[in-house]
UniProtKB/Swiss-Prot annotation:
Role this protein plays: Transports fibril components across the outer membrane. Upon overexpression of the endogenous six-gene locus (fapA-fapF), cells form large clumps during liquid growth, make large amounts of biofilm and produce amyloid fibrils.
Keyword Methyltransferase among record annotations: no
Record gene name: fapF
Location of this chain's protein in the cell: Secreted; Cell surface; Cell outer membrane
Main subcellular localisation: secreted
Disulfide pattern: none
Source organism (scientific name): Pseudomonas aeruginosa (strain ATCC 15692 / DSM 22644 / CIP 104116 / JCM 14847 / LMG 12228 / 1C / PRS 101 / PAO1)
Signal sequence extent: 1-24
Keyword Magnesium in annotation: no
Protein name: Functional amyloid transporter FapF
InterPro entries named among the record's database cross-references: FApF (IPR025737)
Top-rank taxon: Bacteria
Family per similarity comment: Belongs to the amyloid transporter (TC 9.B.153) family.
Disruption phenotype: Deletion of the entire fapA-fapF six-gene locus shows no visible growth phenotype.
Keyword set, alphabetical order: Cell outer membrane, Coiled coil, Membrane, Protein transport, Secreted, Signal, Transport
Length: 421
């Protein structure tokens, strides 16, 4: 009888405790799922920010003018008698060919045209250019912590982005009185970017790759005005000041949505590629050119100010639309170089240029300004340029720019065809 009562008591106790144990297990599972969801959300937001920073760097670097390619300015304006005296005083030197009142050789005419951006070969000139840039970057995302010399606890993803950019430029220039010049530049941009990620399913050996292309579209159109305020002499260089305004006519990068690639929750790619910065900018600059027989030295300095702009949507998350403001970082750019005339038709140049950019800021509606980490840049380039004068009116100008800092494109190759009317 006693044993029967004890058995009944145990059964009753078990029946009463079981619901509480099941409820405790359910609450534990819910907390674990919430924790996992929070980690996934933080990882997704980190990748969104990383992609935005990389996209801003690509657009920021590709939007900059290439390293100056030396070609010919206009001849310094002097009275004929003074020009003849100068020529007699320095007869037989390379500098004399720039001072001579007679027409210089085509290669001398092409020596530093792009160095100052001032074209004096005719009243009107039209230039067509084609440029190809390649840019790649690798960024490591760690979710967890590093222990015991490279043993990773948590998820790991290695993301690499390869960007190929083709730009077709059409530039028209009008030179007035050998002192003033106005120009307009309209680019058409084609882009293709390939995104790679390792770490799918927690494995570092599985790599997912996804390519995104953007159809050829209009980029940011720019307008410029230049004034030649100083003529070259024995002690002074040719000097030109310029002012350029860029309009946001291209596809801006803000509000482009990210989508997850099937089979790899580490990889999110944009559904479109921009062709412009999306903001107005203004760039004052100065260029100097000086003959130092037998070479020509040139240099330039400019500063770009980006205006603050408002957008209806700056959120990259699918199904979410958030308005806000964007303030791209301003930047300085400087360049120096040397050029030589090889013969009457051909010249060659070597140059270095650097772009230093401040950090960008974003502000969602109802929130405060936030600095975008990693959006500053220091892009350095080494440039090789050549000019070949087909005739007095038509030239071919190929150039190669090699990136020497991580923020610069790996390389940029371009060729321009200026024609003078």
């Amino acid at each position: 009888m006693t044993q029967t009562l004890s058995l009944r008591a145990v059964l009753c106790a078990t029946t009463l405790v079981s619901p509480f144990l099941a409820q405790a297990a359910t609450e534990s599972e819910v907390e674990a799922l919430k924790k996992e969801l929070l980690e996934l959300r933080q990882r997704y937001e980190a990748q969104q920010n990383a992609l935005m920073v990389l996209e801003q760097r690509v657009r920021q670097v590709e939007a900059q003018p290439q390293a100056p390619q030396p070609q010919r300015l206009v001849k310094s304006i002097q009275p004929p008698a003074q020009a003849r005296n100068d020529a007699n005083a320095v007869a037989g030197t390379y500098g004399a060919s720039l001072k001579d009142d007679g027409a210089p050789a085509p290669s001398v005419e092409n020596i530093y045209q792009d160095a100052s951006g001032f074209f004096g070969g005719g009243t009107f000139s039209l230039e067509t250019g084609l440029t190809y840039s390649h840019y790649d970057t690798r960024q490591l995302f760690l979710n967890g912590f590093l222990a015991l010399d490279s043993i990773f606890l948590g998820n790991i993803g290695v993301d690499q982005i390869d960007a190929d950019i083709w730009t077709l430029d059409l530039t028209g220039r009008y030179n007035w009185n050998q002192r003033w010049q106005v120009d307009i530049n309209a680019p058409v941009v084609y882009r293709e970017s390939t995104y790679q990620s390792a770490g799918a399913g927690g494995s570092t050996s599985q790599i997912t790759e996804k390519s995104v292309t953007g159809d050829p579209r209009l980029g940011d159109v720019s307008f410029g005005v230049a004034y030649k305020f100083l003529d070259e002499s024995e002690s002074t260089p040719d000097a030109v000041v310029s002012l350029r305004v860029k309009a946001p006519t291209g596809k801006d990068p803000y509000g482009i949505k990210l989508k997850q690639v099937p089979g790899n929750n580490n990889l999110n790619v944009p559904d479109d590629l921009p062709t412009g910065n999306g903001v107005w900018s203004i760039t004052p600059g100065i260029s100097l050119v000086k003959t130092v027989d037998p070479a020509v030295l040139f240099g330039s300095l400019s500063y770009t100010y980006n205006f603050e702009e408002s957008f209806d949507d700056i959120n990259p998350q699918q199904g979410v639309k958030t308005g806000g403001k964007v303030k791209l970082g301003n930047w300085f750019q400087l360049g120096v170089g040397v050029a030589f005339a090889l013969n009457e038709k051909m010249s060659m140049s070597f140059s270095f240029s650097e772009l230093i950019s401040q950090k960008s800021k974003v502000k969602q509606d109802g929130q405060s300004w936030q600095t975008v980490s990693g959006s500053d840049a220091n892009a350095g380039y080494f440039g090789l340029g050549m000019t070949y004068a087909v005739s007095n009116r038509f030239s071919i100008v190929p150039s190669l720019s090699i990136g020497i800092t991580p923020d610069a494109p790996d390389f940029t190759f371009g060729v321009k065809f200026p024609y003078y009317f």
